[in-house]
């Protein structure tokens, strides 16, 4: 897991997390995992094992913006469940800044669209992919153009 439950203290006070989850650490872990899975959906073209790690290996790329994004998503989902003494507008603003919408894209959507280019590794090429020249495959689509003509008047 990229973000551990103790790291949520940058977004929410521990006593607030304890009140929301009723001190159930498994619920915090569940929110963090679902936030990571949500973000992985946006970052499909990058090497997710290098960015997020696996259950046995730690991530090889450490990016604080990515960790911040996971924490904001998980925190937003936690405070939506119950918001004891929490300003939801602040979390909505953080969500809009990090995730955004189609009309007003945030950091994560800009990374997905290629407007922001973090120096993350792309997925490795699949070695089972064959080197087929797709232009030589019989295809129902036919590309052609008329011969160029020179007209003199």
Task: Enumerate the language-model features and the residues they cover.
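Exposed alpha-helical structural elements
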Residues: 7, 27, 34, 65, ...
């Amino acid at each position: 897991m990229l973000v551990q439950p103790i790291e949520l203290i940058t977004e929410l006070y521990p006593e607030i997390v304890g009140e929301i989850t009723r001190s159930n650490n498994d619920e915090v872990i569940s929110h963090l995992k679902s936030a990571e899975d949500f973000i992985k959906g946006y970052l499909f073209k990058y090497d997710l094992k290098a960015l997020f790690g696996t259950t046995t290996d730690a991530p090889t790329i450490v990016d604080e913006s990515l960790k911040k994004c996971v924490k904001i998503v998980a925190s937003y989902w936690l405070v939506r469940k119950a918001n004891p003494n929490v300003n939801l507008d602040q979390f909505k603003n953080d969500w809009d800044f990090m995730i955004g919408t189609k009309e007003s894209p945030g950091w994560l959507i800009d990374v997905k669209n290629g407007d922001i280019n973090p120096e993350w590794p792309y997925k490795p090429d699949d070695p089972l992919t064959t080197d087929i020249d797709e232009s030589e495959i019989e295809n129902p689509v036919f590309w052609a153009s008329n011969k160029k003509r020179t007209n003199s008047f």
